[in-house]
């Protein structure tokens, strides 16, 4: 795992502790590492979401994830997962992410174990124009 993935793991746990499901209010639980597309799900209903924990959130952009898995999911007709952004100031919920909000890029991934960095197709979220709900003010 990379350092960013470790921080994301901590952010997912924090979301599960601090906020309830945006749909029904019940407890959110973390999905297993490596679960495709989603990070948390509701313990009571079928709600699932992607969680991002940006270090410096400006309200506009958030680093996404690997492009390849999302691209394959979209090609088979899956919907884009809702997004929960866990920043220093608040927890935001973006229920609908259009395809136009994705900005593709090639990332250099630094390995935690010191191995050579690798190039990986990624995407970022452009959230500037998207509607959101504040789930929690910190």
Task: List each language-model region with its residue ranges.
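Nucleic-acid endonuclease domains
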Residues: 1-138
């Amino acid at each position: 795992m990379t350092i960013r993935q470790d921080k994301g793991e901590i952010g997912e746990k924090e979301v599960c502790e601090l906020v309830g499901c945006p749909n029904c209010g019940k407890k959110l639980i973390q999905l297993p590492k490596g679960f495709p597309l989603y990070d948390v799900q509701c313990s009571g209903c079928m709600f699932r979401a992607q969680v991002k924990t940006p270090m410096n959130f400006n309200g506009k952009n958030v680093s996404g994830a690997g492009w390849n898995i999302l691209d394959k999911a979209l090609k088979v007709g899956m919907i884009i997962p809702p997004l929960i952004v866990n920043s220093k100031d608040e927890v935001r919920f973006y229920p609908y992410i259009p395809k136009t909000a994705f900005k593709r890029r090639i990332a250099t991934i630094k390995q935690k174990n010191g191995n050579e960095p690798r190039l990986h197709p990624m995407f970022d979220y452009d959230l500037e124009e998207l509607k959101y709900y504040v789930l929690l003010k910190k």
